[in-house]
Amino acid sequence: CFPASKFLDALNANDQLFNIYPLLVYPCKIFNRGGLLKVGGKDTHQLGDGSVIQMNMNLGIYGIPPELENDVYPLFPMVGRVRQLEQWLRNNAGFQHTYCDSFQTRNEFHHMFDHSLYNKMRTKYECKGKFPTVYDKTRPEVDVFKWLKEEEKKNHGIEDTILLG
């Protein structure tokens, strides 16, 4: 999910990373209520009742990349590509829904979301040690950096860093 003004850039990122079509595209109205989502920038609007919203877009990328179907890679570098998309989202004031596959480190996840209120509430209700954090609930189940090395090894060192604008 990303600011609506970044829609064409997001389509280009999908082209470069996955080239999967059709895409599920839908607008999201994000309210600035002090939660985990960061709101701000030129896509922010004030409504008549005084509430602040940000118009975002979301892309659902579902399917098999053509490179995988055409055997371009022995092992499609999915972890590396998702990490590049996550970096693009962080760089463009976007976020990844927590129901998606995520391969972010704890620090990367914290950079993507505003944890101010969340941490305040966890402290107030003494959650530390009793309940897992959002990251702990949604973190990668694989060792991301070990998997990235495996992707590179299986692909015979094929460089797969796509520079997204």
Could you say what each language-model-derived stretch is?
Residues 1-112:
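Substrate-recognition/cap regions that form aromatic- and gly/pro-loop-enriched pockets
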Residues 52, 69, 77-165:
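Activity-critical C-terminal alpha-helical subdomain
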